[in-house]
Structures are given as structure tokens and as C-alpha cells.
Amino acid sequence: MGSEKDSESPRSTSLHAAAPDPKCRSGGRRRRLTLHSVFSASARGRRARAKPQAEPPPPAAQPPPAPAPAAAQGPPPEALPAEPAAEAEAEAAAAAAEPGFDDEEAAEGGGPGAEEVECPLCLVRLPPERAPRLLSCPHRSCRDCLRHYLRLEISESRVPISCPECSERLNPHDIRLLLADPPLMHKYEEFMLRRYLASDPDCRWCPAPDCGYAVIAYGCASCPKLTCEREGCQTEFCYHCKQIWHPNQTCDMARQQRAQTLRVRTKHTSGLSYGQESGPADDIKPCPRCSAYIIKMNDGSCNHMTCAVCGCEFCWLCMKEISDLHYLSPSGCTFWGKKPWSRKKKILWQLGTLIGAPVGISLIAGIAIPAMVIGIPVYVGRKIHSRYEGRKTSKHKRNLAITGGVTLSVIASPVIAAVSVGIGVPIMLAYVYGVVPISLCRGGGCGVSTANGKGVKIEFDEDDGPITVADAWRALKNPSIGESSIEGLTSVLSTSGSPTDGLSVMQGPYSETASFAALSGGTLSGGILSSGKGKYSRLEVQADVQKEIFPKDTASLGAISDNASTRAMAGSIISSYNPQDRECNNMEIQVDIEAKPSHYQLVSGSSTEDSLHVHAQMAENEEEGSGGGGSEEDPPCRHQSCEQKDCLASKPWDISLAQPESIRSDLESSDAQSDDVPDITSDECGSPRSHTAACPSTPRAQGAPSPSAHMNLSALAEGQTVLKPEGGEARV
């Protein structure tokens, strides 16, 4: 008994504590990891780091201390782990202060046994230290994939850069740490600045090719002259057209002048050309805000475009900035497709909407009212049931909540339906009968116009599409033939003064040429073919005109067999279309005429002197014919309205075309076979009109048909034009 009491006494307890068992761990409960212990350990670590700095270190030769009592030999239980915890905390703080994502343990806060992370880009499971955290979103990817992604986005000017997994924009600080490339980062910042400036409507970029300076000009519309303030540039440009300053000219005039200059440079530069082999240029259009060129496949895909430079959202069909309701409005633009609706389709859609709107709105209201009255209570009951389903609540409480919610929704649903229909129906009617007609007529889509005060006129003609880069290239590619050139050639090939004038125009087999077929009795009116004694003045002309580039006009004259052939320059035909390019036009014409009257000439004007000269030639030919008539009998006349001696068809005649004085020397040198044909100068050789035949006609021959003279004019692929007769051929 006494020994048991002594062992249980406090004195015996102190003796046992003074000699602890080395196999037992003291303070095991205090090593348990809890949230409080983590924060308390960090506080103890900070105190432990501050304590050695305050106390001086003990001397090295200090004698060992005297033996203390057993109760004071052991250190406190919490003093042993405090030193390692302080060292770990100091290392973590130093690692967190280092720039970059090189030490992921500091950012992760875990050891090497942390869970691996799967990269969403390369689908490879990696340790957490290779998947840095981002400031903008919680998504993580491997460092190599992020660097490659950032380089690709910056090189293609897709800024600002978003997260690969979501639409959150990456922080520039993260981009700088991931790239570690100052030149690429400078390019990123420049693209960001350009995108911001492009969204400013008053920002104007200097048009100088070696300048990237921008001028923000607020309120400069009235004084459009701007000056680049960059040192060494000082370029003056226009605020409106954003091009080089054009004094004493409007923007349209300056634009036309630049187009002509570009056209001339294109003709004389072999490297600048466009053809079908260069690609479909119809797919290139400028952004309506920043004018950056955008290419899109013409496959009928989505027409909602977003500019990568300024972020402008526009429609590819109408090239206008749009909103979310653009494709639901009566603009004629469709979300998919290659072209907008035609004017006829838009008008029919408008009429159908105006007529069918009351029926459609009534059906919508009739369906919406019962759907809301029945659907709202059902929806409320299901939501309340799903909310109480996962909770541990009594069944009576849940049923009471569901019943109360459904009852209130049954009472409120008719009111909600009535308010919705009462507000929605007037809005729909106002949209159909107000917004739709006004928007269509304001944009010219309805085709309603006033016909000179005679009433309202509805036009169903198709609208012209927007002018694209391809249209400009086509204009530069084929500047010689067009609608205006056809009109000019029509006025050139036909002359007035004959009741049988006529001209028909048809498209040739080549896209770069235009074929003109003319059937006219007055084309050479006033000439020998419609003279007083000649009843034949029918002339068929078929010409192919092609633009050629030569340094100067050339022509030659020759004769083959009995027919007279003329090689002449007809650049004036094309000059009537484009007088500025007269020196670069060349057209070779070969003429053969079936009837062969002698010493008759086709002159290029209808002046009185030329007419008198032709009369003198006719008189000389008649005298020669009367003097030598005994030797050879003239063929009988086929006309009933003329006499045998006066009929021109019964006598041989020679015809020559008068040439300009500028090429008379060439003609005289090549006229060895046509010495009997006299030369005649033309006063109108430099005019843009074509050379027509002119000679006086007698009253008896006016308006007579001319079936015996045929002239066919055909064009070679190389640009030469050959005129072939039915009876022979002459080369020009």
C-alpha cells in the first residue's frame, strides 16, 4: 500500500519526468497538422528569425554550463520543429519574390508529390511546376504550348490575346513573363496601340510609305489639311480621303487623277498585272472602319465578319457596320449566302409582311397567352420541387411550398400574359408598319421614286453591288472596251444623213474584245458607195477592236490582183473612247470592195473641196469611157431606174482611202502597185472620228438600196482587223 501511494505522489511523478524514456516521443499531440497550427507555426518562425538577430551569438570558448536539474535539461516541445519551419518559410518567400514561373513550388504551395496537370493544348500530363498559373483565369496550360500560342497570335496581329480555353483576355504581365522576348513584346504593344487608334474615328495615319505616325485630329473636318509632326517626315495629307494633300481639288477629283496615274503605270509595268490565274479577287474587300483589306472565301459561308485590326463587326454583303439584329431587318442581307436579296425579293417580302402581319401577330398572341397561363405554374412548381429535393425537410413542408408557389403563379400568370401581349403586339405592329417601310425606302431598297412629277414609279431593277478591289482591277485590266466605248464606236461607225442607217452590237468570243457588226447604208454616206449614179451602197462591217500598245501609228498600202487594198491606221476609233491614249492605239483594217469603179476615192471628210475633186474624177472617167466605147462593149445595166451610160455598176472604178499626212511617206513608199491612184490629204485625220467616205450624190440616187457592195470586217486574235470581200481578198 505504501509503495503504491509513494508511486502516485507528486514527488514520484517529478522523479519519473526527470528521467524520460528515450523510446517515447514527447508532445505528440502538438505535432498534429491543423489550420491553427499552420498559422501559429508561421508566426513562431517569424519570431525565431527575429530573435537571433536581436541576441549576440555566444562566444566559441565558453565553458560548458554547470549541470542543471533534470527538469530543466530538455528544451520545450515546440522549440525543436521551429527551426526547420523557419527555414522552409524563408525559402518559399525568396522563391515567390523571383520573377517568372521557374519555381512552381512557390506558386503551388505544394511539394513534389502534387497531382499532375493535363495540358488542354497538347493533352500531356505534366507536373504542376510546368503549368504556370495565369492572373486572369484559373485555366492552366504547359509553358511551351503557351509560348507557341502567344507567338502565333502576335505574329498574326490577333490582339488582344485571350485564354486558349476561355474568352478572358490575358494580362500583359503574364504575356511578358511567358515570352521573355523584348522584340516580340514590342510588336505586341504596337499592335495593341494600332488597334486602339483604329477604333478612334478622328485618328488619321500618315500616308507616307516609310512613316508610321498617327495624327488625332478632333474637329478638323472644316480645315482638312493635316501635317505629320514626325521629325523628318512633315507630310501633308487630307483629313477626309486620308491621302496626300490635293490643293485646288476635291477628294473625288484627286481620286480620279490617282486612278489614271495608276492605270498608266499599270500599262507600262509588266510586273503589275492581274489575271484569272492570280486568284479570285472578288473575295478581297476593305474594312468599313479602318480600310484594312480582308480576304474571305466566296463559298456562301457566314457573312458576319470581324476585323482583326480594329475589331469592327460588319456585313460582308453590304459592307456596313452591323448590330445583332442586322440579319433580321429588311436589309436584304442573309447570314449565309453569296449575295443579298434582289430588289424584287425585298419588295415582295415587304408586301407580304405588310399583308400577313395582322394574321401572324394574332396567331402569336393566341398561342402565347395559353402557353404563359399554363406554362408559368408548371415551371414554378418544378423549380420549387427540385430545390427541396436534396434537402432533409419534411414532406409536409415541401408540399406546402410547392402548393403555395403554384397557386401564386396561377394567379399571376394571366396578368403577366396580358401585360406581355398588350406591350408586345403594339411594338410588333409599329415595327412592321413603321420601321420596315421607312428603312427600305430610306436605303433605296423599295424602288419607289417619282417619275418627273408624273406619279409614283416602282423600279424592279437590280441594285449594283458594292465596288470591290476586283472591280478596280478589272477596270485597270481592260480599260479600252466598255459601255462607253461601245457608245463611242457606235457614233463613229455610223453617220447621219441616210434613212437606212443601222447598227447592231454583239459580244465577241473573247472577254477582252468587243465585236461590232454594223449594217448601214449611210456608214459611208456621201461617198462613192452612195453617190448619185451608184445604186449600191449596202455595206456590211464586222469589226473586232483590241487595245494594243505601240509607240506610234503605222500603215501601209498595197494592191492584190484587181482589187484595191488599203492598210490604214484606225486608232481614232479607240481614241473616241479614251482620247488620252490615242498614241498607244493601233488597229489594222483591210478593205476590199466588190464593185471596182475607177479613180473614185474615199475621203475622210465631207468638205466641199473633196466633193468637187470627186466630181472632177467622175467627169474624166465618163469622157474616157465615151471615147473608148467602140473597142469594148459595156455590160448591160441591171437597174431599171437608170440609163446604160449613167449607171456606175456597168463601169470599172478604182477606190482608195485617203490617209493622214503623218503617214503619207510610208504610203508612198509602199504604193508601187497602185501608181494610178492619186493621193489625197485629209484635214480631219487627227480627229477621233473614223474615216468615212464622202462624195456628192444625185437626187436620183438618194435612199436607194445597195445590195451589190459587200464588205466584211473581221478581227484577228492578235489585234489585226482584216476586211475581206466576197470576190477577193486584200491584206492590210
Swiss-Prot record:
A zinc finger (IBR-type) spans 186-251. A zinc finger (RING-type) spans 119-168, 287-318. Induction: In natural killer cells, by IFNB1/IFN-beta and IL2/interleukin-2 (at protein level). Up-regulated by endoplasmic reticulum (ER) stress triggered by thapsigargin or tunicamycin. Pathway: Protein modification; protein ubiquitination. Keywords: Adaptive immunity, Endoplasmic reticulum, Immunity, Membrane, Metal-binding, Repeat, Transferase, Transmembrane, Transmembrane helix, Ubl conjugation pathway, Zinc, Zinc-finger. Residues 1-318 are annotated as: Required for ubiquitin ligase activity and for protection against staurosporin-induced cell death. It catalyses: [E2 ubiquitin-conjugating enzyme]-S-ubiquitinyl-L-cysteine + [acceptor protein]-L-lysine = [E2 ubiquitin-conjugating enzyme]-L-cysteine + [acceptor protein]-N(6)-ubiquitinyl-L-lysine. E3 ubiquitin-protein ligase which accepts ubiquitin from E2 ubiquitin-conjugating enzymes UBE2L3 and UBE2L6 in the form of a thioester and then directly transfers the ubiquitin to targeted substrates, such as UCKL1. Involved in the cytolytic activity of natural killer cells and cytotoxic T-cells. Protects against staurosporin-induced cell death. Its main location: membrane. Zn(2+) 3 binds at residues 238, 241, 246, 251. Residues 1-112, 618-732 are annotated as: Disordered. Residues 54-79 have a biased composition (Pro residues). The active site is at residue 302. The chain crosses the membrane at residues 354-374, 415-435. Zn(2+) 2 binds at residues 206, 211, 228, 233. Residues 673-682 have a biased composition (Acidic residues). Zn(2+) 1 binds at residues 119, 122, 142, 145. It is found in: Cytoplasmic granule membrane; Endoplasmic reticulum membrane. Belongs to the RBR family. RNF19 subfamily. Its EC number is 2.3.2.31. The first IBR-type zinc finger is the most crucial for interaction with UBE2L3, UBE2L6 and UCKL1. One of its GO terms (molecular function) is ubiquitin binding. Interacts with UBE2L3, UBE2L6 and UCKL1. Zn(2+) 4 binds at residues 287, 290, 307, 310. This is E3 ubiquitin-protein ligase RNF19B.
